[in-house]
């Protein structure tokens, strides 16, 4: 894509939740992108149903990528980074890219070698998710951004929700 990805510093988790809903509504209101052309990818599969519920509570229908079979549907597609592999959407939003979750912290009983392997896999899955948009990538965090974002700041246009 020719557009530089957006990194949105929402400052706290509640504002991040609000921004996600506002941004999806604004994207659809532009008339250029429908709900079905938006993917929201999360680090963990266990977070997907909560995100679909949160969007639904605000009138935005979501479809779990585990149930998506490629049939067009006017719903935001929501899934894990891992499930995003091989799919493309006009707009991809990666919320909750926080320290300790992307990648996860090293477990107390986890060897350095095991952690290095887990971290490598997490970085790879994050990279896959970041390469799914055709037109625009939006990455958000509420507080305490992931070290991966800090390492890649130059690749993003960094903004706050109020800038958009």
Regions found by a protein language model. Give the residues of each.
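Helicase P-loop NTPase motor core
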Residues: 1-61, 67, 120
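Alpha-helix capping/helix-boundary segments
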Residues: 46-47, 83, 144-145
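C-terminal accessory regions
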Residues: 97-164
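Conserved helicase core region in the C-terminal RecA-like lobe
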Residues: 63-101, 125-132, 138-142
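Long, contiguous C-terminal modules that act as interaction/assembly or targeting platforms
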Residues: 52, 56-64, 78-79, 83-84, ...
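A short acidic (Asp/Glu
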Residues: 49-53, 89, 149-152
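Short, contiguous strand/loop micro-motifs
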Residues: 38, 70, 112-114
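Prokaryotic Sec-type signal peptides and long signal-anchor helices
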Residues: 23-26, 93, 160
């Amino acid at each position: 894509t020719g557009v530089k990805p957006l990194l949105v510093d929402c400052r706290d988790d509640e504002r991040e939740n609000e921004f996600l809903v506002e941004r999806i509504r604004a994207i659809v209101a532009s008339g250029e992108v429908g709900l079905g052309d938006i993917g929201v990818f999360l680090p963990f599969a266990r977070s997907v149903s909560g995100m679909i519920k949160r969007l639904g509570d605000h009138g935005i229908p979501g479809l779990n990528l585990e149930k998506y079979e490629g049939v067009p549907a006017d719903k935001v597609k929501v899934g894990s980074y891992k499930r995003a592999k091989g799919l493309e959407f006009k707009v991809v939003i990666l919320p909750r890219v926080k320290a300790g979750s992307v990648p996860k912290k090293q477990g107390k009983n986890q060897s350095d070698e095991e952690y290095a392997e887990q971290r490598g896999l997490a970085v790879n899955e994050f990279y896959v998710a970041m390469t799914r948009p055709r037109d625009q990538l939006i990455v958000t965090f509420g507080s305490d951004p992931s070290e991966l974002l800090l390492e890649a700041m130059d690749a993003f246009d960094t903004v706050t929700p109020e800038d958009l």
